[in-house]
Amino acid sequence: MRKEPRSIELLSPAKDLICGREAINHGADAVYIGAPKFGARAAAGNTLDDIRQLCDYAHLYSARIYVALNTILKEEELAEAEQMIWQLYEAGADALIVQDMGITQLNLPPIPLHASTQTDNRTPEKVRFLQEVGFTQVVLARELSLNQIREIAERTTVPLEVFVHGALCVSYSGQCYLSAALSGRSANRGECAQYCRLPYSLIDADGKEIVSGKHLLSLKDMNRGEYLEELLDAGVSSLKIEGRLKDVSYVKNVTAWYRKKLDAILARRPEYRRASAGHSTYTFEPVAEKSFNRGFTPFLWKERTKDITSFDTPKSLGEPVGTVKELKGNSFTIAGLKQLNNGDGLTFFNEKGELEGFRVNRVEANRIFTLDRPAIRPKMPLYRNFDQEFDKLLSKPSAERKLSVRMEFQDNAFGFTLSMTDETGARIMLTQPFEKEPARRDQAENIRTQLSKLGNTPFEAVEVTVAMSDNWFVPSSLLAEMRRQGVERLISTRRIRYRREEARPVKPCVGETLEIPFPEKCLTYLGNVSNSKAGAFYKAHGVTAVEDAFELSPRKDVPLMFTKHCLRYSMGWCPTYQKQKSPYKEPYFLCYKETLLRLRFDCKNCQMLIYAEE
C-alpha cells in the first residue's frame, strides 16, 4: 500500500502584516507572527485586524498563520490571554505557539497548540509527553544534532519543527535568566536585554586577564541550507527561519533562498510534498549572505566544532568580497571576483580587531573610491554588508505567487460557458447568455489570449481549452467579463474550501493523570511556572513539587544560563575533545563593566553554566 507523501512546511517569520504578505509571496508555506501581547518578542506585537488580513491572504494559497503567544503569564494575565486567544481564532489563526502550560487549562477554542522551543524540547520523552497531551507540533531545541533529531522522530509521531536559519540564542531557549537577573527584563516575558551580545573580558581565579573585551557569548547565525534533505529524511516536517524582528528585505531574500532549495528537493523526492499551493517567481536571485548575518554556522550539526562563535562582533559582517590590493589616496583596488556598486556598504576588522564600515562612493573599472579613506591596508579582507543594487531590487515588488489554473471555454444553447480548475482541484463554472453569430475569423486564438490575461490575480493559466461546436463570434469584452467573474468566484471558492485544522483541548481528563505522566517528578525554577493553572497542569500529570518561576521569585547562586557553547573548548582546553591544558586557574569569570559572571563547566552534559557573582 502506497504511503501518502509527508507534508513539508517552510515556516517564515513576520514582524508585521507587510512582512507576512511578502513571506507568502516569496514562498512560505506558513508564517509565524506575534500576538497583540504575550509574544516572546515584545517589540513585535500585531493588531487583530492585521492578523485577520494576513490569515485571509495566506489561506488563499493554503498557507497557514501561526500566532506566537509564547511568554510565561502572570496570574492576572490569564483572563486577558484567554479572551485574546478567542479573538485570534475568530481572526483566522491556524495555530498558537505557546510556552506557558497554564494556557492549556483555559477555556479555549478548538485551535491547535504548538509547543514553542521555549518549552525546552530536547528529549524524546519530553516531546512524546507533549504529543500525548495534545500538542499538534513541537519546536525542537536548536542545540540538537541530526542524530538526536532523528531519535526523537523515531520515537514520536507529532510533526517536528526545527530552526534552519537565523540568530542563535547562546542559551537553551526558555532556560536563560541572565537578562532577568541583571536587568529585570525577562527573556521568558519577551523582554531579553541581550547580555549575550556584549563585550566581555575572560578572567581567571587569580584575576589574570585571558581575553580582553571580546563578544565571548555571541554566536554566529545558523544556516542549514545545505542540510535540508537530511533533516527531512530524519523526520522533520517544518523548517523554520528565525527573525520576527527582521525587516522585509531579510524575509524576502531568506524565504526565497530556502524555497528554491526546498523545491529542488521536492521535485525529485515524491515521498514529500509541499504544505501549501502556488509557485513563486522572483525578480532577483536570492543569496543568503546578502541579508543580515554574523557569519554562518550549521551549529552542532553532527559534532562539536569551533565555527559557532562570533567573538569579534555581534553585528552583521556581510559577504566576503575579496582583499585590499592597492591603496591610492581615497581609492583602492580589490583582489576578488565580486562586482561592487556605488553605495555599497563594506566592513573590515581594524588593527584592534574591531569591526568598522564605510560606504563606497563610486566604482570605476576595478577601482573603488570613498569620501574619506578608511583605515584599511593591503591584504586586509573586506566584506559587504549592504549591496545597493540588491537592496534596490528588494525595495520594489520582487516576487509573484501564482496558482496554476486550467480553463475551458465552450458554447451552449444560451451562450457560452467558462470553467476554471486550479491546481488543488477547486473548480467553478459560469454561463454567460449571448446571442451567438458566426465569426468571419477564427476565434480560438483570441479566446485563449483574452482568458489568459490573469496578471493582477492570484492565478496563472497553464492551459486554455476552446471547445465550441462552431466558430462563433466572441467579443473580447465578453471574454474579459467572464474572466473577471471567474476569478472572483474561484477566489471565493478557495476561501470556502479552506479548512483549518481543529484540535482537542490540551487538558488532563479524569483518569488521564497516570496515563500521561510528565517526565520529571519535581520542577524547579527551570519549569517556568508563573501561574496557578500551569502548576495545576503539571500536578495533574504526576509532578509532586512545583517551584515558582524565576521571574516570580528570583534566586541567588543558581545557573542563569545553560549553553552548549563552551569557552574551555573555544580556548582549546576541553578535556574531552582537546589535549592542551589551561595554564589558568579556575573558576573563570566574564567581566563587563560592573557585571561579573562565573563560569562552571558541566562536562558530563557537555555544557557551560553561567552564574551571577555578587
Located regions from the model:
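Short active-site loop/helix that positions an aromatic residue
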Residues: 104-109
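Short, glycine/polar-rich helix-capping loops at beta-to-alpha or helix-loop-helix junctions
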Residues: 122-126
